[in-house]
UniProtKB/Swiss-Prot annotation:
Species of the source: Buchnera aphidicola subsp. Schizaphis graminum (strain Sg)
Gene3D superfamilies on file: DNAb Helicase, Chain A, P-loop containing nucleotide triphosphate hydrolases
Gene transcribed to yield this protein: dnaB
Protein name: Replicative DNA helicase DnaB
GO biological process, one term: DNA replication, synthesis of primer
Chain sites annotated for binding ATP: 227-234
Gene Ontology cellular-component annotations: cytosol; primosome complex
Length: 465
């Protein structure tokens, strides 16, 4: 039997041991970088892209690095004399080990040949230390919840860890010479020339006219699909996912915050099988229906490349972590769809809906860029458009539109005239209005709406504006 007093003492002992652990660092690498910068000031621009002052473990080294930066910002050179003089004027020379330590740094660094490698060592150690710090903060948050629910704590933990991951790849960003960019661009153009693919450079939408306007759904893009209720925004987004799943091998990931997975699957079977969805929902199927559905089921089971997550009220961090997992397990994704954006939640921003939507929008855009896949997010529209005579949506009709309009690369609205005009000449016709396209034209294309199949198809009727 383990007695409470022993356990308490043992815990206290372990706590003291943990406190004695020294976080990972490399004083030698830090000294080599600082000494190298005194030898060759021109190395500063390269080094500063890899490390910042806070990456240095030693406080004196942090102070020295900061002083170097300030001297260079003022246009002064960095050497033993200028650095020691500047530190002395600010009363910091004693804190960094006096003139003798600066002289030692300079003396013990014979060259700057490996200065970037040393900077990388400093950065790596700093990231690991930050991981330890964040892990401790997460543990403390678990012990002292301050009234926060587990969902909020998980969101805090995930976002804290993700911030470290974002910093990890900082050195990969920054200016590139036009020669490098031009070489990459010409290579891309050559690939397109050799495999034109009817002008589709992204994910084929399955709709000819939409492909002509967009060249497909492009990697890294945030795509907003918006419409008033009953226009078919979920159906349209699902059709894009279905078409992508049939045309490509990599998985399609669907986050359905509004409908359960079973309803999504019924719609998918109706669409792909061309079977009336009302008969599927009620089970009133004939032999032909079963035959059509059996063929579809066999194809879906053979490909097995559609994932549906019907969890409700997901946070951006949850969406991101789950998408990453599916991406990692399948070595890639074709497309991600979120239905719909306004049902997502950010617990820490729940008191400010505008900031909450802005964070959701920013995270989805970041996810698209990180995984290099198109992310489709469905959105509601403001009711105010119902007061207009022309009820075709425009960008400003997006609910909480500011951040959505800014972050989106492609915005598509759905308008069906028959919803507002019972005797419309355009029954069964849907207008897909491209309100924004960062790298292409805006305008309108038409699709045929087959609601009984939960499906949009290519439009073969007369064109109209």
């Amino acid at each position: 039997m383990v007695y409470p007093i022993y356990m308490a003492k043992n815990k206290s002992y372990l706590h003291q041991i943990n406190r004695l652990k020294i976080p990972p660092h490399s004083l030698e690498a830090e000294q080599s970088v600082l000494g190298g910068l005194m030898l060759d000031n021109e190395q500063w621009d390269s080094v500063s892209e890899h490390v910042v002052a806070d990456d240095f473990f030693s406080k004196p080294h942090r102070l020295i690095f900061q002083e170097m930066q300030q001297l260079l910002d003022l246009g002064h050179p960095i050497d033993l004399i200028t650095l020691s003089e500047s530190l002395e004027q600010k009363g910091k020379l004693e804190s960094v080990g006096r003139f003798s330590y600066l002289a030692e740094l300079s003396k013990n660094t014979p060259s700057t040949a490996n200065i970037i490698a040393y900077a990388d060592i400093i950065r790596e150690r700093a990231i690991v230390r930050e991981m330890i710090l964040v892990a401790n903060k997460i543990a403390n948050a678990g012990y002292d919840t301050q009234g926060r629910k587990s969902e909020e704590l998980l969101d805090y933990a995930e976002s804290s860890v993700f911030k470290i991951a974002e910093k990890r790849f900082k050195k990969d960003s920054g200016p590139k010479n036009i020669e490098q960019i031009l070489d990459e661009t010409v290579t891309s153009i050559e690939k397109l020339f050799l495999s034109p693919n009817d002008g589709v450079t992204g994910i084929n939408t399955g709709y000819q006219d939409l492909n002509k306007k967009t060249s497909g759904l492009q990697p890294s893009e945030l795509i907003i699909i918006a419409a008033r209720p009953s226009m078919g925004k979920t159906t349209f987004a699902m059709n894009l996912c279905e078409n992508a799943a049939m045309l490509y091998d990599k998985p399609v990931l669907i986050f359905s915050l509004e409908m359960p997975g079973e309803q999504i699957m019924m719609r998918m079977l109706a669409s792909l099988s061309r079977v009336n969805q009302a008969r599927i929902r009620t089970g009133q199927l004939n032999d032909e229906d079963w035959s059509r559905m059996s063929g579809t089921i066999n194809v879906l089971l053979k490909k097995k490349n559609i994932y549906i997550d019907d969890s409700s009220a997901l946070t951006p961090s949850e969406v991101r972590s789950r998408a990453r997992r599916i991406y990692r397990e399948n070595k890639g994704l074709t497309l991600i769809m979120v239905d719909y954006l306004q049902l997502m939640r950010v617990p820490s921003l729940s008191d400010n809906r505008t900031l909450e939507i802005a964070e959701i929008s920013r995270t989805l855009k970041a996810l698209a860029k990180e995984l290099q896949v198109p992310v489709i997010a469905l959105s509601q529209l403001n009711r105010s458009l119902e007061q207009r005579s022309d009820k075709r949506p425009v960008n400003s009709d997006l609910r909480e539109s500011g951040s959505l309009e800014q972050d989106a690369d492609l915005i598509m609205f759905i308008y069906r005239d028959e919803i507002y005009h019972e005797n419309s000449d355009f029954k069964g016709v849907a207008e897909i209005i491209i309100g924004k396209q960062r790298n292409g034209p805006i305008g309108t294309i038409c699709l045929t709406f087959n609601g009984h199949w939960s499906r949009f198809d290519n439009y073969c009727g007369p064109k109209y504006d």
